[in-house]
Regions:
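Hydrophobic/proline-rich hinge and linker segments of small-molecule sensing/allosteric domains
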Residues: 11-30
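Ligand-binding cleft/hinge of the Venus flytrap
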Residues: 31-81
Length: 165
């Protein structure tokens, strides 16, 4: 916490979610069912590249289910996006049967998540907030941080897909 003052909060969580195209008939309604379809190699799945944070979370989910990403990619079951927008676009357009994105990106793209990854699957995506020790106006920063903790602010954040903590 070097550089942080006495006020540090775990502010928001962005869930890692599974989405499918609208009207999908593949029966993918959970990460468990996704894993079964990937094992059967009967779907096309989109995830972020390994240098994209959501791709790294997806790799952890694949490992959680003992799925071999390289083998699935070689079998033509996985397609990649160089950023999360590419993943949401492939899902929205129905180019793939399922994909993993952040809840906020699903919201922005008009996608409805069918499942949320648990912390055991891939950890948590946490956004902290803090008042810096070197803040030129620490009192105003503390007041703003206090505002961020209100129900009003939580409603705004939750309205775009975040989970207030």
């Amino acid at each position: 916490s070097r550089g942080l003052g006495d006020v540090y909060k775990r502010q928001l969580e962005n869930k890692v979610v599974l989405c499918v195209p609208e009207g999908s008939d593949k029966g993918i309604d959970s990460f468990d069912s996704l894993a079964e379809h990937l094992k059967a190699e009967d779907i096309l799945f989109c995830m972020g590249n390994s240098d994209v944070p959501v791709g790294q979370y997806t790799q952890k989910i694949l490992a959680y289910y003992d799925l071999d990403e390289a083998a699935l990619a070689a079998a033509g079951v996985i397609t990649y996006g160089s950023n999360v927008k590419e993943v949401t676009t492939q899902i929205s357009e129905g180019s793939v049967d399922a994909g993993v994105v952040y809840c906020t990106d699903a919201y922005s793209a008009g996608l409805t998540p069918v499942d949320e990854a648990t912390a055991e699957m891939c950890g948590q995506v946490i956004y902290p907030a803090a008042v810096l020790k070197t803040a030129p106006n620490a009192e105003a920063a503390r007041e703003f941080l206090a505002y961020l903790q209100t129900d009003r602010a939580a409603t705004v954040f939750e309205g775009v897909g975040f989970t207030a903590m």
